[in-house]
């Protein structure tokens, strides 16, 4: 049976608020900023925590071929709606903590777009996800993350341990709540 994406969102929010970490899906302005640096012909892109698919739709709208996009979503309620809405995109029901062991399956990526609620996660989990993500990213690849806070939601200790830096791309005041987007990249590049 088809379930509308918003019904899936509010069902998941009521059942597991810390896993969702947002009161509503991201808005179009935030989706455009999150995807603004992604060159549609550059290669494969991984999206973590797509939820209802707001960033997925923005990536496809930029011209990214559906075959170059893989979604990693843990919450069961979002899987069927994502598959129905984006039939040519690969949707994996997977914990983003497992990324480090997915290299053979996923191959190398040019960018990672993440809607994960890092502020609700322990530091070891953030380290595993971001470290695993960078094990998949090509040289020059970037990890895009939004946050409702002022600073990057990947703690500076984790960035330092992994040899990464975070730069703010911008802030979207007209999002509910207002949100900032950070580009995380390797320091040596
Ligand atoms: C804040 S919502 C963002 C949804 C969407 N990207 C947006 O911006 O509207 C967080 C998403 O991350 C997913 N998520 C949380 N922990 C996860 C994990 N360990 N692995 C994969 N997805 C996870 C949740 O199920 C949810 O879809």
Task: Show where each model-derived region lies.
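Core SAM-dependent methyltransferase catalytic element
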Residues: 171-189
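S-adenosyl-L-methionine
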Residues: 1-40
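Glycine-rich SAM-binding Motif I of class I
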Residues: 53-57
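Conserved class I S-adenosyl-L-methionine
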Residues: 42-51
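Conserved SAM-binding loop
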Residues: 82-83
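Conserved SAM/SAH-binding beta-strand->alpha-helix loop
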Residues: 75
């Amino acid at each position: 049976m088809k379930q509308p994406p918003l019904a899936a969102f509010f069902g998941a929010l009521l059942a597991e608020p810390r896993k969702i970490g947002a009161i509503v899906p991201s808005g179009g302005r935030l989706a455009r900023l999150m995807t603004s640096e992604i060159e549609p012909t550059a290669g494969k892109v991984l999206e973590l925590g797509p939820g209802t698919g707001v960033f997925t739709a923005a990536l496809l709208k930029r011209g990214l071929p559906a075959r170059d996009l893989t979604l990693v979503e843990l919450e069961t309620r979002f899987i069927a709606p994502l598959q129905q809405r984006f039939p040519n995109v690969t949707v994996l029901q997977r914990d983003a903590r497992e990324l480090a062991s997915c290299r053979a399956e996923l191959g190398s990526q040019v960018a990672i777009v993440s809607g994960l609620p890092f502020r609700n996660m322990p530091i070891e989990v953030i380290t595993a996800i971001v470290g695993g993500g960078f094990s998949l990213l090509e040289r020059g690849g970037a990890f895009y993350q939004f946050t409702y806070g002022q600073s990057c939601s990947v703690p500076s200790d984790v960035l330092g341990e992994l040899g990464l830096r975070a730069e703010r791309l911008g802030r979207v005041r007209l999002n509910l709540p207002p949100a900032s987007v950070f580009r995380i990249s390797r320091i040596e590049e």
